[in-house]
């Protein structure tokens, strides 16, 4: 009976550890996604005015890939994100694929509690966010 009790306790501890690690990864991913959302909005605000097609036309917001990436990195630096997240990187695909949408892709390493010795480099997570600027009167 003692062996059975010890076995159940070990299984319960194992389940609790796995749930705790999975919850930690999930929460860190949500934090990274929130950071990516803020960076994409900041990047979408870095537009320049496009050329007018005709005299009565309305100006358009034009984004460049380099400017989007620069604005995203600046946003992350101002918010201390590089200190909060381990191995935080801005992916090379960050930019503006169509000149109107800012796409920010962030990647970081998560170190879950208790099971950190099993994955010493951490678990890589990635968050993608898009934002658009629209001019209106």
Listing of model-derived features with the role each one plays in the protein:
Residues 1, 7-9, 15-16, 77-79, ...:
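Short secondary-structure boundary micro-motifs
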Residues 1-68:
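Alpha-helical assembly-interface signal, strongest on the long, hydrophobic N-terminal helix that forms
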Residues 42-105:
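Short amphipathic secondary-structure patches
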Residues 106-112:
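Generic short beta-strand segments
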Residues 112-137:
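Low-complexity, S/T/G/P-rich flexible repeat/linker segments used as non-globular hinges
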């Amino acid at each position: 009976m003692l062996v059975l009790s010890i076995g159940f306790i070990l299984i319960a501890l194992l389940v609790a550890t796995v749930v705790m690690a999975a919850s930690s990864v999930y929460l860190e991913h949500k934090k990274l996604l929130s950071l990516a959302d803020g960076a994409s909005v900041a990047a979408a605000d870095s537009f320049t005015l496009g050329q007018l097609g005709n005299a009565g036309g309305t100006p358009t917001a034009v984004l460049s890939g380099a400017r989007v990436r620069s604005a995203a990195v600046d946003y992350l630096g101002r918010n201390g994100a590089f200190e909060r997240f381990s191995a935080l990187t801005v992916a090379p695909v960050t930019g503006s694929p169509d000149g109107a949408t800012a796409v920010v892709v962030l990647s970081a390493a998560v170190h879950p509690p208790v099971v950190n010795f099993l994955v010493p480099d951490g678990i890589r997570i990635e968050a993608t966010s898009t934002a658009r600027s629209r001019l209106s009167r």
